[in-house]
Regions:
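Redox cofactor-anchoring modules in respiratory/redox and cofactor-processing assemblies
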Residues: 1-188
Length: 188
């Protein structure tokens, strides 16, 4: 799904590349927009970038770049997508799905969501990126189930691949893609 020409359900052999799926089978990006990222593996999967388009889709290759096959779903994003908002969106979903049994997942995802919401609303603080990464490490290493262990993957992968977007939100109070409403300023 996402911002490509053809969306739908396809079946490809293990080892197919993201480039084959997005551009050959999916027809490329809508409206001539530039590919920015693809989120793979369901709500707790990682976000991959152009450098990963020729990566074979298999368990080991994806694990090396901080992603997973998971449900096999792909969400394709173009240049107009705010990656901080993407991380917030998936953390919101994961936090809602937490059963609450273990503290790292229940409280850690709640705290990560609070920080991400603060950032997209223009109230990010110095140290938020490091705090997100610290919480992600704690949650992934101490949670009891697969959801908790992978909950922070979208946040970690977007920080790794789009750190400058987080920094623009926090320090410049700007959303480079122009999507975060609280960070849009108007002049007359």
């Amino acid at each position: 799904s996402g911002k490509r020409i053809e969306n739908g359900l396809i079946e490809v052999p293990m080892g197919a590349t993201l480039r084959e799926i997005i551009f050959d089978i999916g027809g490329g990006m809508k409206n001539g927009k530039k590919f920015k990222a693809v989120q793979i593996g369901g709500p707790s999967g990682g976000c991959l970038i152009t450098d990963n388009l020729d990566l074979p889709l298999d368990f080991d290759s994806l694990k090396k770049v901080g992603a997973m096959i998971g449900s096999g779903g792909l969400v394709v994003m173009d240049e107009d997508t705010c990656m901080v908002e993407v991380a917030r969106f998936f953390m919101h979903f994961t936090q809602n799905e937490s059963c609450g049994k273990c503290v790292p997942c229940r409280e850690g995802t709640k705290r990560m969501l609070e920080i991400l919401e603060r950032i997209v609303n223009g109230n990010g603080r110095d140290g938020d990126i490091e705090l997100l990464l610290e919480l992600a490490d704690t949650i992934s290493s101490t949670a009891l189930c697969g959801l908790g262990k992978s909950a922070a993957m979208p946040v970690v992968s977007t920080i790794k691949n789009f750190r400058s977007e987080y920094e623009a939100h926090i320090y410049d109070k700007k959303c480079p893609s122009g999507n975060c409403k609280k960070l849009i300023t108007y002049q007359i």
